[in-house]
Amino acid sequence: MLGDNLQPAALVQVFEDVICDDYYKTNSLPPASDGALANPCKAQPIQKELALVRGFQQLVPIFPSLLCTVPYGLLAERIGRKRVLIMSGAGVFSALSWVLAVCYWRFASIRWALLSGAFLFLGGGDAVISTILHVMVTDTADDAERAQIFLYLHAADVISGFFGPAISGPLMEKGHTWIVLLLAAATLFSGAFLLTIFIPETLNLRKRSTDDSALLSDSTSPETTDSPRSELPTPTKLSNSIVGEASNLLSPLLSVLASNRQALLLLLIFSPQTGARELFTLIGLQYTNAKFSLSYARGNVLLSLFQGAQGLFVLAILPLITRLVADRRGWSAWARDRLYAIVSIAATALGLMVIGIAPALIVEAFGLLFVAVGSCSTGLLMSLLGGAVRPSQVSAVYSAAHMLSIVVRSVIGPVLSALLVTGLELGWNWMGLPFVTMALLMVGAAVASSFIRSERVANFDED
């Protein structure tokens, strides 16, 4: 988590430097008297290329996510969650290493950095990591604890998001942008190969209820769960088994989505949440730099504010509201999470709209605070989704949720980056176009969330 949150501002700065150098190798520098271009790297062609590269970089994970999430999820059922988690971390580390190699040695165009997605086929990338972590929580926690643990995971993410920019900002101010990126790479390496040693394997801890045993018959057989040191299948048998189990898993999943309208509704609402929350990280620094002339290094302050507000809300304010209001009124976990999710999505929509139309930097900061309030919607919706299906279907719908989220985020990235380019071309008043567009999408999600059932039902296949 910390490795990811150290990168955003430093990567934008390095990308801009590389694009700027490449551009002026074939184009003359602007006249020194041109006050509008005191920094030659702020020329529109350079900023346009930067926005497009950053946007298409979000498209990179879509193919590994689509092709690998289910197979690696099934592989985790056979060889263990922990081993797949290590593989996924190794793939993410390798992808970042490729980007840094392209930018440092410059042996190819900056667009070659987009090939980092090929390394994500090792382990499946962030989608598999997120899915495995959620399944590990489901292995060990009951319904009452699940939502709280998901919020704690989100809190860990936002806390690292606070310290990441707080660390990178001062280093970038002193010109140590590459030190920040090397620190990020070292952190990812530690997370992939060192910290995972201390994470227990949860495959054998799964409660062996009738519903759980129906998830994947092979994954709960004595050969794979009761005897952790049993002989592993050969690669050929494992490959054939994964293909067969993928087919067996997708068929019930499609059946669930066709018959369980609540699960389908929750999946559709969940899909744009991560993209909305990460929009400022994706294009916010470039947007703020263009609109309010705030440097990327100092833009880390906004990222720290954003992440710190998320942590404060998730760790302190939301639990306090739960104790003072929800618990005293006797709300069920489902009713509580439903209301929180609706309010969170509405707050995100409001915050994005404020950022998009902000006339001053302080107003943009207030918009970020509203988005921070809405940032817990992902954990809340995942909890609702887990409660809307049978226990035997949780792993499948979680995989579907993360795949859908990655796909939507990957598609939204280039689209909103293109809107940022359009806004830059149209002028100051239109620069917030991508934020306003995303705000309208979240308004639709907020309206849709009002159709979530007010109470959990026993018959999961009811419409």
Predicted regions and their residues:
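Glycine-rich segments within core transmembrane alpha-helices of 12-TM secondary carriers
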Residues: E145-E173, T187-L188, Q310-F313, H402-V415
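Cytoplasmic helix-loop-helix junction between adjacent transmembrane helices
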Residues: S116-I159
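Juxtamembrane intracellular "pre-TM" segments in multi-pass secondary transporters
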Residues: T202, R206-G275, A290-K291
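C-terminal ends and interior cores of transmembrane alpha-helices
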Residues: L85-S109, I342-P359, E364
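A membrane-interface helix-boundary motif in multi-pass transporters
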Residues: E173-L188, A333-L339, V415-M442
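Intracellular juxtamembrane helix-capping segments at the cytosolic ends
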Residues: A10-L11, G124-D142, G284, C376-R390
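Multi-pass alpha-helical transporter architecture, strongest
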Residues: F189-L203, I355, V411, V421, ...
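A late C-terminal transmembrane helix in Major Facilitator Superfamily
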Residues: P391-E425
